[in-house]
From Swiss-Prot:
GO molecular function: rRNA binding; structural constituent of ribosome
Source species: Oleidesulfovibrio alaskensis (strain ATCC BAA-1058 / DSM 17464 / G20) (Desulfovibrio alaskensis)
Name of the protein described by the UniProt record: Large ribosomal subunit protein bL20
Gene: rplT
PROSITE patterns linked to this entry: RIBOSOMAL_L20
Swiss-Prot/TrEMBL GO biological process terms: ribosomal large subunit assembly; translation
Length: 117
């Protein structure tokens, strides 16, 4: 019996066009350009999930450094002092303290200074 591939092709085209919904112009209407746009966007999203982690770590370090310097300690000395004091707060929490709880961060900085001297 002869097999016609119209159903499979239609399903595949529909899948890509559904994923391209919301794109502008031919990218949401034409199968080929929609497929290219979707494949590229999937590649970008995969890459950028990795990049996001790096970017947030950079942001946290930047915020901790700024707050530590306001309290008279550099970032590297601050982190080293925390290790000496046995305080195991991650950079995300430290950055949050630096932004939202300045007094508590200042207390941490004083503790670090005492451990470093």
């Amino acid at each position: 019996m002869r097999v016609k591939r119209g159903m499979a092709t239609h399903r595949r085209h529909k899948k890509y066009l559904k994923m391209a919904k919301g794109y502008r112009g031919g990218r949401s209407k034409l199968y080929r350009t929609a497929r290219e746009a979707v494949e590229r966007s999937l590649a970008y999203s995969t890459r950028d999930r990795k990049v996001r982690k790096r970017e947030f770590r950079k942001l946290w370090i930047l915020r901790i450094n700024a707050a530590a310097r306001e309290n008279g300690v550099s970032y590297s000395k601050f982190i080293h002092g925390l290790a000496l004091a046995g305080i195991e707060l991650n950079r995300k929490v430290l950055a949050d303290l630096a932004v939202r709880e300045k007094e508590d961060f200042a207390k941490l900085a004083e503790l670090v200074k005492s451990k470093l001297s």
